């Protein structure tokens, strides 16, 4: 699998078909394929890259962003597309400027092995630790820390389902014509009540606060992008992670959305 949803963009970058690609990222749609294909993709801060006129201008889950083969190209591309836009109410009143100049020569970095609490396959965990030690040898200060974001999984599922209802409101009578993943999310969203959504938003705020507080001590947080390596393209999703059965379609990319 090339990952998704911007799997074509990531595969094309890796194959040398084009130098840049773009897409949107709600729960990992830029970062997942980038990780599977060995290129780079980021989910920018909400509003940094304007979406322009759209049906739901105030939604803050899915955001547009760039993909590239290296961090330099990614930064330059982001500078080009991250501009204010008067038809995007979440767009800030400034442009993003890319710079390769370091804020400080020695960075304070924290590694969170399993932020979603779903386990990490050994091959992925070993590679992450190799990178961790390589950064340490370059002189950066690194700590292994624990930040429990497992509650974010349920909150994301609720908010994602609601976002699907918002996006496909005019098509709720045609669910039988849709794929299982989309129709399943819409059905869940239609069955939720306001308390479900309120609890999810509260959890979202609590998770954000946990992460924000870590930046009092660290310049950046390091995590595995995904807990698994690419799986066969014929499979809709992996059946297990670190020897444990997955409970739903989105378990395997929990690390990108908690």
Q: Which ranges hold each PLM region?
A:
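Active-site-proximal alpha-helical scaffold in enzymes
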Residues: 1-35, 67-68, 78
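Short pre-catalytic strand/loop immediately N-terminal to key active-site residues, enriched for Gly-Thr
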Residues: 1-4, 62, 245-249
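A short helix-breaking turn/cap at a secondary-structure junction
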Residues: 40-126
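Glycine-rich, small-residue loops and helix-cap segments
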Residues: 75, 81, 192-258
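Short helix-loop capping/hinge segments that flank enzyme active sites or metal/cofactor-binding pockets
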Residues: 103-112, 159-212, 224, 228, ...
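Acyltransferase
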Residues: 122-146, 169-173, 197-218
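Short connector loops at secondary-structure junctions
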Residues: 141-156, 186-188
């Amino acid at each position: 699998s090339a990952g998704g949803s911007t799997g074509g963009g990531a595969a094309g970058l890796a194959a040398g078909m084009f130098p840049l690609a773009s897409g949107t990222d709600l729960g990992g749609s830029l970062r997942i394929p980038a990780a599977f294909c060995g290129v780079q993709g980021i989910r920018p801060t909400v509003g940094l890259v304007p979406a322009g006129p759209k049906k739901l201008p105030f939604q803050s889950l899915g955001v547009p962003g760039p993909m590239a083969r290296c961090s330099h190209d990614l930064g330059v591309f982001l500078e080009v597309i991250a501009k204010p836009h008067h038809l995007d109410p979440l767009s800030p009143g400034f442009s993003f400027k890319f710079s390769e100049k370091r804020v400080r020569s020695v960075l304070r970095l924290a590694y969170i092995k399993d932020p979603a609490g779903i386990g990490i396959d050994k091959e992925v965990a070993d590679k992450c630790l190799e990178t961790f030690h390589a950064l340490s040898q370059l002189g950066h200060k690194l700590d292994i820390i624990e930040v429990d974001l497992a509650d974010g999984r349920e909150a994301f599922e609720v908010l994602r389902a609601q976002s699907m209802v918002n996006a496909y409101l005019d098509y709720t009578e045609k669910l039988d014509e849709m794929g299982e993943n989309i129709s399943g999310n819409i059905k869940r969203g239609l069955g939720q009540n306001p308390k479900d959504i309120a609890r999810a938003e509260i959890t979202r705020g609590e998770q954000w606060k946990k992460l924000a507080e870590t930046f009092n001590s660290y310049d950046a947080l390091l995590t595995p992008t995904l807990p698994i390596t690419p799986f066969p393209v014929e499979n809709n999703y992996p059946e297990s992670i670190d020897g444990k059965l997955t409970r739903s379609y989105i378990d395997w990319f929990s690390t990108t959305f908690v």
